[in-house]
Amino acid sequence: MITGKQLRDAVISGANSILKNRKFVDDLNIFPVPDGDTGTNMSMTIGAGSDAMQALADNETTAKVAKAAASAMLRGARGNSGVILSLLFRGFSKGLEDTVEADGTQLAAALAIGVDSAYKAVMKPTEGTILTVARVAAEKGAAAAEIDNDPIYVWDAICMGAAEALATTPDLLPVLKKAGVVDAGGQVSA
């Protein structure tokens, strides 16, 4: 089971990783606008979620942690990529409502709700972006949960699915292939 403390620590760790790799992600940013700010925007967005995590006790439920992260990210969202990231977390949070701890099936289902929320919010969803990476990750997580409900097993499948999907983004978006890069937002979610 994933505890609230583990989820809280994962949000903080993810924020630290994105911040550390911000420049690398900024340099990948060519779609939809080559303005080189995806890493910055996403680090600010998840950074807001990380800041909210600092106030939470070790014994908080996964529901409360997910809701606090999602609310803070929505308020702190910057740019298109940050808004999409916050929507993924908002849906993820809805998927974990009323959970004290989360098993693998709940984790995968929550991610799928997050993906659905993000796709619905984007006027013209484009494949080869963070949306694709998150969708494939959620699909891999759901398939893994059918085999083994262990959240670590499911999380590993989610991460592998995200990495696999990220590698395909240049095949789905010719502008990425031409530049020889993967999708910047997808890089963060992988």
Annotate each PLM feature.
Residues 1-190:
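N-terminal loops that bind phosphate or other acidic moieties
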